[in-house]
């Protein structure tokens, strides 16, 4: 809309006079409805705006009248001011929202006070102490279990899982003995003990029970090679892929080349009386003997190859350079038998490559020297 300045002298005559402008001028009559009397139209030559520009007067509450252009100007100014205020309020609200918003998503982390830090530290210390005591109790229980199971070694220690497996097999073997009511064969007993165990643990159990671990391997080949046939049966010779450390290469090849169905007519004699004495002295339950001899405290040497049969042997000290067998050593004690028969499996025979045809069985050598004690102990497993 076009606006005009009221300073022009031609427009001052057109401005209506209001009752409130005068100092108590109440000469103008008022209607009951508050409408002012109609004003006469302006003179055409007075320079006033024409009919197109003339606006109807707007009556107010007190009978005041203002022209329409003035009212439109007031409305425009009010709308512009309201929009500016709304924009300012929106900007302030955004600033406040950005200031209150946390930097990271998720629940707001509680502020750690000194009391909360002390409580958290105390809880952590108690949890660590409980876990430490639990592990100490578990290790102590496993150590006690290792003393009970039939496996003993001063240099090696069974792992936790192997200890539990051996204890389970030991309990199963004892329950089978109670169920059958018979004394088991040593080989079947060791087979039950070593079921599911690793090869190092199997060798350790066999060494404690003074047996060759090859005689009770639980997994047999399809052709039956390396199978133990029991008392009175032949050994099926099994070729070994690694060479013998104590014999010459030709002798090991001769011992290993007998596989593939060829078997020696070697009778499986009974176990040595010294082995059975150690086993029976513990009550027949398979408890491990306590070795006090310094001969068995050294590390294990490579397996000893004798006609295809491998057995573990301790590294002997310079005092034990004779390298005679454990059973021959204890069987040669006074009161057992003459020492001449105890050198059948001696070091000279081993180094000389004695074949199985030249070796006499244990029963043939010592039958006339056996006393009642040997007969009774041997009958413990072969009744």
UniProtKB/Swiss-Prot annotation:
Q: Which SUPFAM superfamilies match?
A: HLH, helix-loop-helix DNA-binding domain (SSF47459)
Q: Where are the transmembrane segments?
A: none
Reported modifications of this chain: Ubiquitinated by the APC/C complex; leading to its degradation in neurons. The CDC20-APC/C-induced degradation of NEUROD2 drives presynaptic differentiation.
- Keywords, ordered alphabetically: Activator, Developmental protein, Differentiation, DNA-binding, Neurogenesis, Nucleus, Transcription, Transcription regulation, Ubl conjugation
What GO CC annotations are associated with the protein? nucleus
Q: What happens when the gene is disrupted?
A: Mice exhibit small brains, ataxia, reduced seizure threshold, growth failure, and postnatal premature death. Show excessive apoptosis in central nervous system. Lacks nuclei of the lateral and basolateral amygdala. Organization of cortical neurons into barrel structures is disrupted; thalamocortical axon terminals fail to segregate in the somatosensory cortex.
Biased composition, class Acidic residues, residue ranges:
79-98
Q: In the UniProt entry, what is the domain comment? A: The C-terminal region is necessary for depolarization-induced and calcium-dependent transcription activation.
Which PANTHER family does UniProt cross-reference here? BASIC HELIX-LOOP-HELIX PROTEIN NEUROGENIN-RELATED (PTHR19290), NEUROGENIC DIFFERENTIATION FACTOR 2 (PTHR19290:SF83)
Q: What name goes with this protein?
A: Neurogenic differentiation factor 2
Native source species: Mus musculus (Mouse)
Which taxonomic lineage does the organism of this UniProt entry have?
Answer: Eukaryota, Metazoa, Chordata, Craniata, Vertebrata
């Amino acid at each position: 809309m076009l606006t005009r300045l009221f300073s022009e002298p031609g427009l001052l005559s057109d401005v209506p006079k209001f009752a409130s402008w005068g100092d108590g001028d109440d000469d103008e009559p008022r209607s009951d409805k508050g409408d002012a009397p109609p004003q006469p139209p302006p003179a055409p030559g007075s320079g006033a705006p024409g009919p197109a520009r003339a606006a109807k007067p707007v009556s107010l509450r007190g009978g005041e009248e203002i022209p329409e252009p003035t009212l439109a100007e007031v409305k425009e100014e009010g709308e512009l001011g309201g929009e500016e205020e709304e924009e300012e309020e929106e900007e302030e609200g955004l600033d406040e929202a950005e200031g209150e918003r946390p930097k990271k998503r998720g629940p707001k982390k509680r502020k750690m006070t000194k009391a909360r830090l002390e409580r958290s530290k105390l809880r952590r210390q108690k949890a660590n102490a409980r876990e430490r005591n639990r592990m100490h109790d578990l290790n102590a229980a496993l150590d006690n279990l290792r003393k009970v199971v039939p496996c003993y070694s001063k240099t090696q220690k069974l792992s936790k899982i192997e200890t539990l497996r051996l204890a389970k097999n030991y309990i199963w073997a004892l329950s089978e003995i109670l169920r059958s009511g018979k004394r088991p064969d040593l080989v079947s007993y060791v087979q039950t003990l070593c079921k599911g165990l690793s090869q190092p643990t199997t060798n350790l159990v066999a060494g404690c029970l003074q047996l060759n671990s090859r005689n009770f391997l639980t997994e047999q080949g399809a052709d039956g090679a390396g199978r133990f046939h029991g008392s009175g049966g032949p050994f099926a010779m099994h070729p070994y892929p690694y060479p013998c450390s104590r014999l010459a290469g030709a002798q090991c090849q001769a011992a290993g080349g007998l596989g593939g169905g060829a078997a020696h007519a070697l009778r499986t004699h009974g176990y040595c009386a010294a082995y059975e004495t150690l086993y029976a002295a513990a009550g027949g339950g398979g408890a491990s003997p306590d070795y006090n001899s310094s001969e068995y405290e050294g590390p294990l040497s490579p397996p000893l190859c004798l006609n295809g049969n491998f057995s573990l042997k301790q590294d002997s000290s310079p005092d034990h350079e004779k390298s005679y067998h454990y059973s021959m050593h204890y069987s040669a004690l006074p009161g057992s038998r003459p020492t001449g028969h105890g050198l059948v499996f001696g070091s000279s025979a081993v180094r000389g490559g004695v074949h199985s045809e030249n070796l006499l069985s244990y029963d043939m050598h010592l039958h006339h020297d056996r006393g009642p004690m040997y007969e009774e102990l041997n009958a413990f497993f072969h009744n």
